[in-house]
Amino acid sequence: MGSLGSKNPQTKQAQVLLLGLDSAGKSTLLYKLKLAKDITTIPTIGFNVEMIELERNLSLTVWDVGGQEKMRTVWGCYCENTDGLVYVVDSTDKQRLEESQRQFEHILKNEHIKNVPVVLLANKQDMPGALTAEDITRMFKVKKLCSDRNWYVQPCCALTGEGLAQGFRKLTGFVKSHMKSRGDTLAFFKQN
């Protein structure tokens, strides 16, 4: 499904930030998407970086940053030059939803990701009692917080892979549009 890199010079590179609380399933879904197989992950201390090519002309460099409390303090350092944000929510961990929502709201205030498209992945949909994508949209105030950007909430299951491709395809479309509008803006300023 994914490849390490593209040999096609026409391929554009996009930087994607993959965030969420610890144990939300970020690394599991990244490697499920990239390798299309189950792997055992351990909590990410620091970050993982992988390139995924879902379309011939766009390669995503995905920065999977650890979600432990001490790592969240440095999330902002990874925001510069970001073309897309994927925020992963454990839809079954109702005790930490408020904390996750606060972190989501905090990262959206970072100046470097202003107008950057967002896909929320409502993970662990295979578990009983998982909140729906609609529940997550409402609880995370996505319509209000993301009114200045493209956004989408995708239900998924990192273990089975269900919903991952759809969520990342949506992100890819948003990223292309964002990069084009940013490129048009840069071209305008170079001319004037």
From Swiss-Prot:
Source species of the chain: Homo sapiens (Human)
GO cellular component: cytoplasm; cytoplasmic vesicle; plasma membrane
Subcellular location: Cytoplasmic vesicle
Chain's gene name: ARL14
Sites where the protein binds GTP: 20-27, 64-68, 123-126
Family under the similarity heading: Belongs to the small GTPase superfamily. Arf family.
The keyword Repeat is assigned to this record: no
Main location: cytoplasm
Subunit note: Interacts with ARL14EP.
One GO MF term attached to the UniProt entry: GTP binding
The protein's role, per its UniProt record: GTPase that recruits MYO1E to MHC class II-containing vesicles via the effector protein ARL14EP and hence controls the movement of these vesicles along the actin cytoskeleton in dendritic cells.
Protein name: ADP-ribosylation factor-like protein 14
Gene3D superfamilies: P-loop containing nucleotide triphosphate hydrolases
